[in-house]
């Protein structure tokens, strides 16, 4: 059997008695025209290593295999093992891994080779997976990922936009992020109640150090935890006005208008304050 002679996705689902599980945030993308477009947007080809999370019935998997890429598909739902094994039998360059992507070791999966992440992510784990990939020790070659439209907007938002927040800062501090494709709800089975979008992220060559990323997460959590307040109030516990002025920012500004570079400067200022030796208090006479 080859990819061309496999049953259609709907036929495969029916043959195995499979359906989407709400608990796993599953919505199946069965239109091969759309999955092939996503594979093109991923810019992968012959011999490239691709990690796909949540392949489900394998629609995007098939499209990626058609490019000649070597696909490592990570699936949590054991129900799909027989169906995906049929795809693997037809495509020797597909490797199946059953387990939780949140705890997966991508460096081990890819055997140390550069790997691209291409996935129609389950809605309920998309954001934590993205944070893991952008801030963890392993750096992907690129990420082409589908999210709920609202999450995609939060990843790519600019300062001053309603969707701009902590996720945008972390994503854009570590990667060049841009929306590349909208996908209507009707394209999925079952149709979700929201629209979806594909985001393309290319990790920056000079990614912030782990210490700088930890500091960035700390200052963004404080700043956006009270996003309507001035920085002098929201960052009071981290150093207040001295911290903010050390970063070259206006203490009266609000988090929603501070650019990514400003938050990186805040992270640097917080690290500098933390590492500075404490000044001894003068002794009384």
UniProtKB/Swiss-Prot annotation:
Primary residence: cytoplasm
InterPro entries reported for this sequence: KsgA/Erm, rRNA_Ade_diMease-like_C, rRNA_Ade_Mease_Trfase_CS, rRNA_Ade_methylase_Trfase_N, rRNA_adenine_dimethylase, SAM-dependent_MTases_sf
Pfam hit, one: RrnaAD
Keywords: Cytoplasm, Methyltransferase, RNA-binding, rRNA processing, S-adenosyl-L-methionine, Transferase
EC number: 2.1.1.182
Name of the protein this chain belongs to: Ribosomal RNA small subunit methyltransferase A
Gene: rsmA
Lineage: Bacteria, Pseudomonadati, Pseudomonadota, Alphaproteobacteria, Caulobacterales
Coiled coil: none
Catalytic activity: adenosine(1518)/adenosine(1519) in 16S rRNA + 4 S-adenosyl-L-methionine = N(6)-dimethyladenosine(1518)/N(6)-dimethyladenosine(1519) in 16S rRNA + 4 S-adenosyl-L-homocysteine + 4 H(+)
NCBIfam families: ksgA (TIGR00755)
Source species: Phenylobacterium zucineum (strain HLK1)
Family to which the UniProt record says this protein belongs: Belongs to the class I-like SAM-binding methyltransferase superfamily. rRNA adenine N(6)-methyltransferase family. RsmA subfamily.
Function statement: Specifically dimethylates two adjacent adenosines (A1518 and A1519) in the loop of a conserved hairpin near the 3'-end of 16S rRNA in the 30S particle. May play a critical role in biogenesis of 30S subunits.
